[in-house]
Amino acid sequence: MFSGRFTVCLFFVLSGFVLSLRYLGVVAAGNPDLGASIAKRTFRLAGLLLTTATLGYVLMCADLFFNNEVAAVTGSSPWFSYMWATDLSLGAFLHILVFDAFSKTDVLNPPLWTIGYELYGSFLTFGLLLFFRKTRLRFIAYAAALVLLQGSYYQCFVLGLFLADIYQNVSGAREWLSRPAVGASFLIAGLLLAGSPAYLPPEALDQSAYGFLPQLDMLGGGYSTLGAVLVLLGTIGSAWLHRFLTRPAIAFLGTISFALYSSHMLVQGSFTSWLFLLLLERVGYDGSALLATMASLVVMFPAAWLLWRWVDVPAIRLSSWVGVQFLARVQSKSKA
């Protein structure tokens, strides 16, 4: 079993890595391209955030969330019952959407708490690249950022940047990571740490398989982040994993992953919960849980595809246009 926090940490570490790659190495893109990436980042993330937050508000107003009733049956309080617990007026909703979209929309759609980290973590990554990527002091800057941000999820982005720098600039790093024994060792160790529980009382944690591990409070995300780093190290040099991850079905999941992540909890809190309660007295707890889960997958994937097609793709096009306009403005000023 993987901890849910592990997937979040992997997402953040991978973001720092991927966002940095093209700005490091021998043929790195220049500062104008980096500026364009900064300019368009907000637009890239805003489409699905604003849309799914609005969907969450509509479902709240229509009283179509059944998470409280499900939490009482399953014992998943307070986690599940705390969701959508805020009674928002239309004015308060619009205020959040206009002024606090990247900090408070999680009251409308809980997974959106990560998107604020993603935006500002991206800016942190781009800022470090802008000021330090061409200097020999950049690794000192990375270390300083890790110290200043200790205990924060923003460390994940710095770690991703650090790994990208090593991968692009350190001689022999790619060859070493491509060795099957090295990659497999990192991957196995990372997957073992991926199960480290995020939220357990100390006495329960001590009795788990991870109870012998010392506290890792200085690292945001703890062992979930460490596991994410190791999984990335075990993946980037693996030829067979690259072939697997580029298969059509896996590539499709990657294409709709942002839309799926942004919408899955809305489905679970509404349709899944409603269907579970409807079936509970008819087929029992286990049967209703299984059938509701299977039916939810039938809803989630088409919904994610629709959001990708009609929201995410236009957001990508808009952000690309913003980047092109930024570069055109820079070029026109340089010629003046």
Please provide the spans of the model-predicted regions.
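Functionally critical transmembrane alpha-helices in membrane proteins and complexes, commonly lining
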Residues: 1-25, 46, 154, 225, ...
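Interfacial loop-to-helix transition and helix-capping segments at the boundaries
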Residues: 1-8, 104-117, 145-159, 175-184, ...
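Juxtamembrane transmembrane-helix termini
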Residues: 7-41, 48-68, 161-167, 267, ...
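Structural signal for the C-terminal ends of transmembrane alpha-helices
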Residues: 20-28, 59-62, 128-137, 162-172, ...
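Alpha-helical transmembrane segments of multi-pass integral membrane proteins
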Residues: 189-313, 335
